[in-house]
Amino acid sequence: MRKTVMTFFLLQMLFTTSVFCNKHLDGYYLFVYFSGNQTSNQQICYALSSDGIDFAPLNGGHPVIASDSIAVMKGVRAPHILRGTNGWFYMVATDMDWTKGKWSNRGIVMMRSQNLLDWEHHTVDFHQRFAGTEAAKVYAVWAPQTIWDPAAQKYLIYFSLHSEKDGQYPQEAIYYT
């Protein structure tokens, strides 16, 4: 089981976080990550690889995007990056600070950039955005990812969500928007 999980992780890392920065960097892989569970580690970091296996941290291993400037909870986890059909880079991440509890992730952070350094961002806090609805009862939004839907000609974000429901088992599902 452990080998299967590790294989899945490596395949996902290679295929979902690979982007080509500029023409002179074609053939390199960019890995976008956070480094730990402390608030100071839940920030966006980059690593680069020429073979997709051995990655070297960029920026001295320091964050390239400070979470306290983009996230409601002042921490981000599970970043996912995609190079858009228009040449822009799109990144989504869980808006969460693990030190505030494992159910402190009530939203997502969406970002876009033309150069991987200067990012525009927008947060969606489900408790605020959907106040008074069932969606406001969310207490676990996990690992958002972005895909391009060629039929609809737009980007979709999908994520898992755990919400408060009556009964013994809370509702867990995968959603997209």
Where are the regions that the model predicts?
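Beta-rich carbohydrate-recognition and catalytic domains
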Residues: 22-141, 147-177
